Amino acid sequence: MILPQAIKPVVTHLSHQDRLLAFYKWVGIPLRSKATVLLVHGLGEHIGRYTHVAHYLQAAGYAVFGYDNHGHGMSSGEKGSLIADNQLVDDLRFVIEHVRRQTAGPLVLVGHSMGGLIAAEAAVQNKQGIDLLVMSSPALGADTNPVQKLLLFMLPSLLPNVRVDNGVRSQWLARDERVVKEYENDHLVHRKISVRLASWILRTGEKVVREAE
């Protein structure tokens, strides 16, 4: 397979309610694509890090789009914050509708880590508009002890917007040192997570697993 040259995506901002979402459209989208792929990124990163994935999919005949979640990348909001429980899923639904107006044929959601959780919860709530769901290491289970879990259920009502280190370590992401360095030097990457977002990830991960069964 011959991959296209590394061309940066065209980035615009979509206005949704009181927030702006950075929307990515990779150029060279096939006129007659096999399907449309919408990429959803993980905690602390941004969708621009998936350009190599977009180029690979384009070469295989897929149209590719993506966006930065609220509080991530070039989208609005404090880094790692969450306004309301269903906000991230609501944003994804808004982007799906925007993509659907531009394309025809099947829509494939590809979500990594927190993005996999957002995509899975969207599918559990309403499969309409989603033809296929692909998850990479989805955040469906957190390694927490009973005390930590209790705190994450209680603290959002007391200190919802307090932000702490998100615990993501660059050395976990790849064996390729070049990839690790790029991540560490990326000014759009952050290492913050609010109490409300951490609680939502924990609760929603358990909910998705329970309801998917």
PLM regions: where:
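Catalytic nucleophile-loop/oxyanion-hole region of alpha/beta-hydrolase
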Residues: 44-46, 73-103
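Helix-rich cap/lid subdomain of alpha/beta-hydrolase
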Residues: 145-185
